[in-house]
Amino acid sequence: MLIAHALGMTTPSIRPGHPADIPAIAAIYAHAVLHGTASWELEPPGEAEMQRRFEAILAGGYPYLVAERDGDILGYAYAGAYRPRPAYRTTVENSIYLAPTAQGLGIGGLLLDALMQACAARGFRQMIAVIGDGTGASVGSRRLHERAGFRLIGVAEKVGFKHGRWLDQMLMQKELGEGDRSPPGL
């Protein structure tokens, strides 16, 4: 059950992101950069850079979704290229960020489910989650992905340094659509 609904809150709608969402998206991301390890950036980018990134995701044919309730953006999720080489063209990497007040309410699961559906509909076959060090919000991210059927495929140890400590990085993977049961449409 969606915890937000159990608390008497209306279920947020999941919809494609729009340029008007960029200020809220930038604020959510800035908080993640400054206070967490989901992003390994050290300084939050400004709205102009977030707009550029948003446009690049859409121009690449990838989905960019937001969770909205009563006009407030509670979180966002998008997929992008896992790696730039052509053989990776059917594999995407996901990113999900939630406003601090939206964490732990089931909204991440709504975003992830919608993102997986949107990626499968576009013909992507594998989704990779690159998850920070396994503490704080990263614990929630791992649980979120496990509940969605992702499996841990590896841990790179002590590969990042942020907030005065070394960070591990987890890789999780989930098959989408046809997975590897047939060759991709070329």
Locate the predicted segments by residue:
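C-terminal "cap" of GNAT-fold acetyltransferases
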Residues: 92, 158-186
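Acetyl-CoA-dependent GNAT
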Residues: 16, 44-101, 112-113, 118, ...
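Conserved GNAT acetyl-CoA-binding A-motif
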Residues: 119-133
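Conserved acetyl-CoA-binding loop-helix of GNAT-fold acetyltransferases
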Residues: 104-121, 140-143, 147
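A short beta-loop-alpha structural element at the N-terminal edge
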Residues: 13-25
